[in-house]
């Protein structure tokens, strides 16, 4: 446990970024993320990884300031052109976010890895955490899910080009607009949906907020091809582990199949924001943001299980 009074959130919480208090109500946010390629195109991989790294700042209501590259690359095995394309993808996505990449660190490694350290800023009274959800709130999810299943299918050469393109477009999309729209409406809790899957991150919100959530499966949107692929047996190991964990804290409708439950727990890369917000503001958000954002459920008083999935 960190005893420094300037530290607001750190590794002991399940929030999306480290937050340190400066002065005059200002705070610094910092996060780091990197991973191995999940698509074949180097430039697209760089874009996706950068968008994923930036997401944690947006999920806390912060404004990114600058970033550093983290690079691992097998310099003796792969062409420098591939590395240049990866880093160009990251640089272009950072530019879209309005920030520079000002440095970084690289090592020789057996497998390519790429990501960013991102530093952001915010006003302390305005930051979001996952601990403020209140009974009566509506839950909004801003992107479809299914990237883990599709990424696994890409590696197995089981994904069509149309499915790959759809998932890549979703993963490349910054959560910038969603965060900016939400900042006008003061949501009660926000997180981004990433490695623990939708249900896993929702469990974190409910436990941190001492509430429960009621989700309508039929309102959740899945990426093109994700349902077909899981029905064909494409099941990422991380997503299965997520489901094993979620079943200890979730009441799943008996009408849901194993594959449907797995989709809800699919580990995401550069997923959307999960927003807990008052009903009147939820409607405003959906009208202003547009896109593929949907209301997927509501927050309720605490029950034994933090999450219930209806069908």
Indicate residue ranges for each PLM-predicted region:
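Glycine-/charge-enriched secondary-structure boundary and capping motifs
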Residues: 75-100, 107-112, 184-185, 194-311
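N-terminal glycine-rich phosphate/pyrophosphate-binding loops that anchor nucleotide-derived ligands
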Residues: 1-59, 134-139, 144, 162, ...
């Amino acid at each position: 446990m960190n005893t420094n009074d300037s530290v607001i959130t750190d590794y002991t919480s399940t929030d999306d970024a480290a937050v340190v208090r400066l002065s005059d109500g200002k705070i610094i946010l910092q996060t780091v993320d990197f991973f191995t390629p999940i698509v074949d195109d180097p430039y697209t991989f760089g874009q996706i990884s950068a968008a994923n790294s930036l997401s944690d700042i947006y999920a806390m209501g912060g404004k990114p300031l600058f970033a550093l590259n983290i690079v691992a690359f097998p310099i003796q095995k792969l062409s420098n052109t591939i590395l240049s394309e990866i880093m160009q993808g990251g640089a272009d996505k950072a530019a879209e976010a309005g920030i520079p990449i000002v440095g970084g660190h690289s090592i020789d490694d057996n497998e390519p890895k790429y990501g960013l350290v991102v530093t952001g800023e915010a006003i302390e009274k305005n930051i979001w955490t996952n601990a403020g959800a209140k009974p009566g709130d509506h839950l909004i999810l801003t992107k479809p899910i299914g990237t883990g299943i599709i990424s696994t299918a890409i590696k197995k050469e089981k994904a069509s080009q149309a499915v790959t393109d759809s998932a890549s477009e979703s993963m490349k999309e910054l959560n910038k607009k969603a965060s900016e729209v939400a900042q006008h409406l003061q949501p009660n809790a926000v997180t981004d949906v990433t490695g623990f899957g939708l249900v896993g991150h929702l469990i974190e919100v409910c436990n941190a907020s001492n509430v429960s959530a009621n989700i309508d499966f039929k309102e959740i949107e899945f990426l093109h091809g994700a349902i077909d692929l899981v029905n064909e047996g494409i099941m990422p190991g991380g997503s299965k582990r997520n489901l094993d964990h979620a079943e200890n804290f979730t009441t799943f409708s008996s009408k849901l199949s194993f594959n449907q439950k797995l989709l809800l727990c699919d580990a995401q890369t550069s997923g959307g924001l999960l927003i807990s917000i008052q009903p009147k503001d939820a409607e405003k958000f959906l009208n202003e943001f547009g896109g593929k954002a949907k209301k997927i459920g509501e927050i309720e008083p605490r029950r034994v299980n933090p999450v219930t999935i209806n069908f």
